[in-house]
């Protein structure tokens, strides 16, 4: 048994011993060469050179070559990774620069919008201040108008209306200018009142048996002289008031219309009574409409003395809207009245030419005085240009319409400014985005 155990041990040792084969020899040589290379790299102060045989063995071994190739591949991958990181950082810098540019553009646009809003607010404040000043002037003028004595005009007007003869009525009917209401100053009223009573006794002495033609001509001449005397007094202050504030003069003219029958001369009240039925009905209808509108208007517009506190915002806004609506309605109504009066005047002049040709010649020579006198006389006579049939806005109405058109243009431009700003900002943003879009697409593709 002991011998068997000894044999087994010997057999195991024999089996465990390596067999010298050509492959094992090559591997051992490669290992030795690797050891030499490692020892050479580690012993740099005192290098141990590698033999030429080791170099040849290492270069000829495929395993070493594959390892070296793999190492080169790793280096290449590392280089690619570094390049990608650099490109990414560069792209991020570009994107940040584009974002900064966009933010700067947006900030500039916001600053411009704020500046425009500031200028608009300043302009709106200035306009509001101007409106407040104009309303204060209106209040002062209305207070002064309310203080004027008007009751003294009624007795002479009634006495002269009774003393009028049929000749006077016929003469008054030839003047359609007296049918339109107008507002006069106390100086012209006093002159006409002085002339009215002086004419009364003469008419009573003559009686209805006097001739109607010469009497009518004389009355027309006296009325023309009184108008020429009153015009220089009226043209100075009234033209200044209208030039300084067109809407104020227009309002005063509107306010003076309902009071015209009491303030106009005695001969003119008689002329209104002697008008044909059609013209009189049209005038009464228009006067009733004006009185209804003035009664329905806010009190703060026409009577500044009734306001307990100066300037209420809500009342001012309502009054402005009501004024704008009333102006256009007044212009339309006035145009209709003018056309009706011109028609009546044409018919009456034709009748008078048939009756008295000499008188028609005098009227034709006197007619240009109404056309070239200026806005003062046209307003006092009822605001009616005689030789301009196609323009209702002659004289003062031209200023009124120009003022209204400028006001509407300002309001329209103020409403359009915010919309234009928004459109400009949107177009600028779209242009910037279109510039940036291709660059972003190229970055994404890369």
From Swiss-Prot:
Residues 105-138, 226-243, 319-346, 403-420 have a biased composition (Basic and acidic residues). O-glycosylated; contains chondroitin sulfate (CS). CS attachment is pH-dependent, being observed at mildly acidic conditions of pH 5 but not at neutral pH, and promotes self-assembly in vitro. Parathyroid CHGA is sulfated on tyrosine residues, whereas adrenal CHGA seems to be mainly sulfated on oligosaccharide residues. Glycans are attached at residue 413. Residues 85-426 are annotated as: Disordered. The modification Methionine sulfoxide is found at residue 361. The modification Phosphoserine is found at residues 97, 209, 286, 319, 360, 387, 391, 413, 427. Its main location: cytoplasm. Disulfide bonds join 33-54. Self-interacts; self-assembly is promoted in vitro by chondroitin sulfate attachment which occurs at mildly acidic pH conditions. Interacts with SCG3. Interacts with ITPR1 in the secretory granules. Belongs to the chromogranin/secretogranin protein family. This is Chromogranin-A. It comes from Sus scrofa. The lineage of its organism: Eukaryota, Metazoa, Chordata, Craniata, Vertebrata.
């Amino acid at each position: 048994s002991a011998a068997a155990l000894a044999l087994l041990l010997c057999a195991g040792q024999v089996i465990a011993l390596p067999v010298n084969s050509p492959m094992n020899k090559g591997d051992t040589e490669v290992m030795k060469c690797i050891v030499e290379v490692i020892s050479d790299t580690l012993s740099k102060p005192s290098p141990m050179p590698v033999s030429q045989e080791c170099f040849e063995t290492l270069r000829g071994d495929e395993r070493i070559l594959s390892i070296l190739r793999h190492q080169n591949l790793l280096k290449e991958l590392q280089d690619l990774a570094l390049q990608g990181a650099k490109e990414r950082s560069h792209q991020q810098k570009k994107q940040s620069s584009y974002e900064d540019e966009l933010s700067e553009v947006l900030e500039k646009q916001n600053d411009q919008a704020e500046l425009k809003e500031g200028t608009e607010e300043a302009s709106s404040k200035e306009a509001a201040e101007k409106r407040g000043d104009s309303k204060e002037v209106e209040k002062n003028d209305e207070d002064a108008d309310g203080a004027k004595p008007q009751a003294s005009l009624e007795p002479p007007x009634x006495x002269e209306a009774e003393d009028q003869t049929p000749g006077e009525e016929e003469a008054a009917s030839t003047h359609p200018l007296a049918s339109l209401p107008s507002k006069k100053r106390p100086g012209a009223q006093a002159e006409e009142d002085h002339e009215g009573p002086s004419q009364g006794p003469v008419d009573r002495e003559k009686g209805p048996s006097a001739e109607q033609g010469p009497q009518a001509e004389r009355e027309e001449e006296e009325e023309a002289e009184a108008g020429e005397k009153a015009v220089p007094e009226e043209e100075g202050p009234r033209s200044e008031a209208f030039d300084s504030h067109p809407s104020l003069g227009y309002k005063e003219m509107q306010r003076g219309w309902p009071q015209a029958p009491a303030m106009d001369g005695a001969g003119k009240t008689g002329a209104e009574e002697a008008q044909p039925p059609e013209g009189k009905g049209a005038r009464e209808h228009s006067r009733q409409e004006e009185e209804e509108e003035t009664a329905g208007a806010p009190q703060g517009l026409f009577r500044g003395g009734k306001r307990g506190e100066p300037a209420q915002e809500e009342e001012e806004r309502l009054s402005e809207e009501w004024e704008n609506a009333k102006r256009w309605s007044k212009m339309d109504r006035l145009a209709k009245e003018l056309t009706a009066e011109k028609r009546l005047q044409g018919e009456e002049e034709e009748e008078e030419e048939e009756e008295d040709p000499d008188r028609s010649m005098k009227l034709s020579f006197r007619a240009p005085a109404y056309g070239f006198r200026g806005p003062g006389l046209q307003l006092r006579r009822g605001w009616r240009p005689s030789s301009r049939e196609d323009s209702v806005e002659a004289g003062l109405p031209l200023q009124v319409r120009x003022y209204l058109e400028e006001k509407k243009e300002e309001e329209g431009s103020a409403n359009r400014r915010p919309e234009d700003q928004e459109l400009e900002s949107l177009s600028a943003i779209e242009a910037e985005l279109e510039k940036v879009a291709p660059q972003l697409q190229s970055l994404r593709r890369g």
